[in-house]
């Protein structure tokens, strides 16, 4: 799970041919405001991102533009370099979660998760162009796949405000 630090209001800019957030490499749709279901949830301008820099998301991610732009930087500076030419490159990011109005780790009484503000995305793995699947659950800390995941995680730690991986808790 990666999440951004809170920031003041942000502007959503729609680009040409399905681009969002003013970045032609981020494809998706603007979905507008998401009303708060409970106090602390919701976001002013949500986007539903379907691909970033040519890499498809397994399911579109509902996030804010700051998160989308940070995710794009991570794809370019972390994910793609970590994978390199292995398997022909990255075809897909497996998204396990994005916007959801819920408490942290779905624990009753906990603070609202960054997911509830559109500032977090859970990534469970990647699929390479040759069909190879690398998952956090199966491959973390194991062989070349584990090295790829560790490199991806390290760059995410530099890009996002909060990054939770397998060492964080049983939920990640």
Q: Each predicted region: which residue ranges?
A:
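Residues that form or immediately flank small-molecule/cofactor binding pockets and catalytic motifs
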Residues: 54, 97-98, 141
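Active-site-adjacent substructure of cysteine-protease-like catalytic cores
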Residues: 84-118
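Catalytic cores and adjacent binding grooves of peptidoglycan-active enzymes
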Residues: 36-38, 44, 69, 80, ...
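Short acidic, glycine/proline-rich loop/turn micro-motifs
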Residues: 60-62, 105-107, 136-139
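Active-site acidic/histidine clusters and adjacent loop/turn architecture
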Residues: 12-94
